[in-house]
A protein has these predicted regions:
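Hydrophobic membrane-insertion alpha-helices, especially the h-region
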Residues: 1-4
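Low-complexity, Ser/Pro/Gly/Ala/Val-rich intrinsically disordered tracts
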Residues: 6-34, 40
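GH16 jelly-roll
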Residues: 36-295
Length: 295
């Protein structure tokens, strides 16, 4: 497989296989700030310019960067199936979804990851069945995880009833909860869900919010999460959209999931209708993680 991972800082992340990266990042990648003040976010300071915070925090160092530059997905960093507690199979979640996860729907084109959702008949084996839709997903489980820091993607979300793309984090240790939904788009409702699931199964709790003030569909935007002990900030295009504080904020290493999906009638985006466009694509230009130097 061609290598499409652009670099890591040793010691800042877990689960990265040595010898598979094409470059090593040294020093810090920080935003350029002219003037401004500093405010505290946990133990870290964040630059403020014109009333807007600048992410990542200035002293954070780039720990992980994936730009999907190769012709094929780097299997040393990404899987295309998802084994999560409570799922009905590695390639099918539950009856909130209509799609089966297919490797054919994970594409790298023009320097972007393109996760396709398609209306086609698929015979699956995990679990067995015939599915009317397929879609693509990548997961860094057992390959890359991190505990605290700032994670960001630049992405373009598809639209249409039943369309259900998501950028989320799950715990490396197979348990569930917790879960971070950094940017989960309910396209049928034109709503971006910003969620945190916590508790002890089966007693789970959702700490959720949503916003509808960004042109999500067909436009490139950045989506990020600043995660520090006891605090999380959801950020879109450099603007904080919500905050969670308290002991329910996850404290365990988490891995990255990027997925496109098709909602059933009981799912949050509703079932597809005649106006839903297939194929549709959840496109990602990059995934980056920054961490404080002491991590």
């Amino acid at each position: 497989m061609a290598v499409c991972f652009s670099g890591v800082l040793s010691g800042a992340v877990t689960g990265v296989v040595s010898g598979v990266v094409s470059g090593v990042v040294s020093g810090a990648e920080a935003p350029s700030v002219v003037g401004g003040d500093l405010v505290e976010a946990g133990r870290q300071s964040i630059a403020v310019r014109g009333g807007a915070q600048v992410f990542p925090p200035m002293e954070y160092q780039l720990a992980f960067e994936e730009r999907f530059a190769g012709p094929e997905l780097n299997r040393d960093l990404w899987s295309t199936s998802l084994r999560v507690f409570g799922r009905w199979g590695d390639r099918y979640h539950n009856d909130s979804y209509l799609n089966y996860l297919s490797d054919e729907d994970v594409l790298l084109e023009n320097g972007h990851l393109r996760l396709r959702a398609e209306h086609r008949s698929v015979e699956g084996d995990n679990p067995p069945g015939v599915y009317d839709y397929s879609s693509g997903m990548v997961s860094s489980h057992d390959k890359f995880s991190f505990q605290y820091g700032y994670i960001e993607i630049r992405a373009k979300f598809p639209g249409g009833r039943g369309v259900w793309p998501c950028f989320w984090l799950m715990p490396q240790g197979h348990q569930w909860p917790p879960e971070f939904d950094i940017a989960e788009y309910y396209a049928g409702r034109r709503m971006m869900h910003l969620g945190l699931c916590h508790g002890d199964f089966p007693e789970i709790n959702w700490d959720s919010d949503a916003n509808e003030d960004v042109d999500f569909e067909g436009a490139w935007n950045t989506y990020g999460l600043l995660w520090t002990p006891g605090r999380a900030l959801w950020i879109q295009n450099g603007v904080v959209k919500r905050e969670a504080k308290g002991s329910h904020v996850p404290s365990v290493p988490m891995y990255v999931i990027l997925s496109n999906g098709v909602s059933s009638k009981i799912g949050p985006s509703g079932a597809p209708d005649a106006q839903t466009k297939f194929p549709n694509y959840f496109e990602v230009e990059y995934v980056k993680v920054w961490q404080a130097p002491d991590k």
